[in-house]
Amino acid sequence: VPRAFDGSHLKLPGASGAFVLYEHQKRGIWRIIASGATYLAHAVGAGKTMTMAAAIMEQRRLGLIAKAMLVVPGHCLAQAAREFLALYPGARILVADETNFTKDKRHRFLSRAATAPWDAIIITHSAFRFIGVPSAFEQQMIQDELELYEQLLTKVESDDLVSRKRLERLKEGLKERLEALATRKDDLLTISEIGVDQIIVDEAQEFRRLSFATNMSTLKGVDPNGSQRAWDLYVKSRFIETKNPGRALVLASGTPITNTLGEMFSVQRYLGYAALLVRGLHEFDAWASTFGDVSTELELQPSGRYKPVTRFATFVNVPELIAISGPSPTW
């Protein structure tokens, strides 16, 4: 039975008495405190910012984290800072957008972030990419991805030239990224060197396109192509996981799963990669075979003709899927 979280007992020392949080907000706060990695799947207007602010401050008070980084869309930066300080007037927060990372400002900003005991650093999605991790760590992650592609290539039928060429192309892209990292200078403080041991991402659907290796890309509902933004978050969260296991990442969005089966796989990689790895489900094909049901139906094409289309239609083994994810997302 999935664990139920009840935050009605929370007192929230330091919070302004001008606000009374709703039950769902307290459930979300307690879920993050009790479990760490969490997906706040709360609707737009449900007060996610205050939920995240209170979760940060309570974890700080309890010694569960040292410094959080709250990543928000650019147009929400000022609002997020205002709401954070409205709920916790005494909070020590540092606010930054991409203008803080121009060549003449980035060293100063990172030094300021590292040398003061901030409760939270609030930063925009676009500025987040300037926060680095050690090149050696990202290189190892790319090597691990390359090994997955090599394993898939051994399983491709010899006459399936299309799949082989597609996998080879994706593999070359990873090799190019690896070469670029080999020449990159690590002359800036990394995310752990500035003291961050938890990342909280608002509007996390912007990071949902995390690439993965698969031989199923011809199926409808499977999109293995990813974005640099998603990969960037994945690397940083995996790095923080080595420093603060179980509390590296919290995601928040009103639209957690939108279009494809692969998005659920990406969420699990973000929040529970170790659980997938121990079960041998860290490869998409094994995961999809376990939790996805394939169906073929005739669909009307623009030409007016019907064509059989095979797609991932539904999730199966849902109780097991939820068990791997931990307790279900807070609603």
Kindly label every feature range from the protein language model.
Residues Q59-A66, L271-L276:
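Post-Walker A helix-loop "phosphate-sensing" segment adjacent to the P-loop in P-loop NTPases
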Residues R106-Q198, E206-R208, R229-G262, R269-W331:
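Inter-lobe coupling linker of SF2 helicases/translocases
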